Amino acid sequence: MWVFNRDGFFSAVEHRDDNSNVMVRARAKEDIENLSSALQENHQLLDEDTAPVYTPDGDYHYRLTVSKKVWGEYLNSAANDLDYDNFKNSVHGQSDRDSAYMGVWSAMYAFQTSRDVNETYGESDCPEPNVK
C-alpha cells in the first residue's frame, strides 16, 4: 500500500516475519520521523516501539514496524484530519518533493488517459465505476 499524506510518502506491507505487524518503509528520513512522531502522539507508543531503522542496503532506506491495528488507526486519523481540497497544494513547498509528487501524479494521469482511450474503443476489461 502506498500512502501519500502530509507526513510523507510510505510503502506499507505485511511484515514477513510477523503477519500481525506492518513494515512501513519510507524513502526520506524526514517522512519516517514524521510518522514515528505521529504514532507516538496519537497512539501513546514509547520511543523504542516506533524507532525508525536505517537500512542502507534496502530498497527503502527507512523502516519501522507497527501492528496492523496501529497502522489502521493512523490511516483513520489521517482521513479524519483532512482539511484541504487539493493535496498537491497542501504539501507544496519543497522543490524536490514537489517534483517527485508531480512525477507520480503525471504517471497516474498518463495511466488514466491510456485507460480512457481503451474504454472509448472497447478494449478495456476495466469495470465501470460504481457511482452512487
Feature map (PLM): residue ranges:
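Structured alpha/beta or helical-core interaction and ligand-binding surfaces enriched in interleaved
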Residues: 1-132
